[in-house]
Amino acid sequence: MAKAKFERTKPHVNIGTIGHVDHGKTTLTAAITTVLAKQGKAEARAYDQIDAAPEERERGITISTAHVEYETDNRHYAHVDCPGHADYVKNMITGAAQMDGAILVVSAADGPMPQTREHILLSRQVGVPYIVVFLNKCDMVDDEELLELVEMEVRDLLSEYDFPGDEVPVIKGSALKALEGDPAWEAKIIELMNAVDEYIPTPQREVDKPFMMPVEDVFSITGRGTVATGRVERGILKVGDQVEIIGLSEEPKATTVTGVEMFRKLLDQAEAGDNIGALLRGVSRDEVQRGQVLAKPGTITPHTKFKAQVYVLTKEEGGRHTPFFSNYRPQFYFRTTDVTGIIQLPEGVEMVMPGDNIEMTVELIAPIAIEEGTKFSIREGGRTVGAGSVSEIIE
C-alpha cells in the first residue's frame, strides 16, 4: 500500500511542552495524542514511547527530543517534548526545535518552581512568541482558592518576563486522568487545544518573509559574471530583483540578480529551501564572499555588538574542560562562517562553567548580518564549545 501522503491542507504550527521537571510535560503530551486519537486526529503515543526520546545532533550538540504530530479541526501541529531540563535549554538555544508557541505545564500541587522560571526566561530570550498555561494535577488539589493562587503566581511570573500574564489562557486539568480516559478530564485537553488553536497565531511562512540567502560559495563564469551559491533561508528571489550583499564589510553593496539557477537549470524564481546559484550584475569575484548574505534591500543590517543567550557545552559533550572569563575570544560561527568575537560576562558573574546557560555580550571583529533570534555556534580550534541565540542587538 502506498505510504500516506502528508496532506498540507491545514496551516502548520510548531509547539512544545515546557516547564519544571515532573510537573507532567510528557504525560500531557501523551494525553493530547491519546484524546485526539479518539477523534481520529492523532496517533496515540504512550508515555514510555515519548519519554524514550531519540538523540539528535544540532550545531554539534547532542539533544534528546521527542517529536509527535497531531491535528485539530483547524491545524496540523508538530509538538516537541524533551526528557531532561538540559535538553530544553539546548533545544531552545540552538533552535533545533523552533517553537511558534509553547504549552507551559505547571503542577497545581507545587506551583511554579525554578525551571518554570528558567523556561519562561528562555522563551523570552530565544523568541518563543506565545505561551499557553496548563495547570496540571488539579485532581490532587481540593481547595479552589489554592488553584486560584497558583494561577495568579504563574500569571505574575509570565508578566515579569514581558509575556501578557493577564491575557494568557490558563487551563486547569489533569493529564494523567485524561490519559486514563476520564471524560471530565479529557474535556480539559480539548479545552487546552482550543486555547492553543485560538491564542497562538499561525506563523508567517518562511516563503512569505523578505528574501535572504547566506552565501556559501562564490565563483565567476567567464563572460557572464559572478555567481553566489547557497540555500535560500527565507522569501522568494526572482530574476531582476535588487539585492544587497551584507556583512564582513562596513557598507552593504547593492546589485541586481540577472539569473537564478538550480541543478544547472535556469529558473524564473527560487524560494525558501532551494539550493541555488544567483548571478550578480556588476559584482567582481572579490566583492562577495562566504559568510555574507544576499537579502532584500533594507531588511537586515550588519552588526558587531549584541547580547546573546548561550549554552556552554560540558566536557562530556566535547566542550571545554575549564571555565572561561570575560575577554574570552573564541570564534562565532554564523550560518556559513567563523568570526572572532570578544565576550563580556554580566556584572557579578566572574566565570562561566561548562554546562552553564548564561546571557553575555559579544563584540565581533567584523560586522555580520544578524537580527534578534539569529542562531550561532561558539567554536574554539574547530570544535564546538557553545551554542547561542541573539537576544538583543546593541550596535
From Swiss-Prot:
InterPro entries: EF-Tu_GTP-bd, EF-Tu_GTPase, EFTu-like_2, EFTU_2, G_TR_CS, P-loop_NTPase, Small_GTP-bd, T_Tr_GTP-bd_dom
Span list, region G4: 136-139
Region of interest: G1: 19-26
Superkingdom of the source species: Bacteria
Metal-binding recorded as keyword: yes
tr-type G domain mapped to chain residues: 10-204
MF term (GO), any: GTP binding
Annotated spans, G3: 81-84
Subcellular localization, as worded in the UniProt entry: Cytoplasm
Binding site for Mg(2+): 26
Protein function: GTP hydrolase that promotes the GTP-dependent binding of aminoacyl-tRNA to the A-site of ribosomes during protein biosynthesis.
Protein family: Belongs to the TRAFAC class translation factor GTPase superfamily. Classic translation factor GTPase family. EF-Tu/EF-1A subfamily.
Protein name, entry field: Elongation factor Tu
Gene (name only): tuf
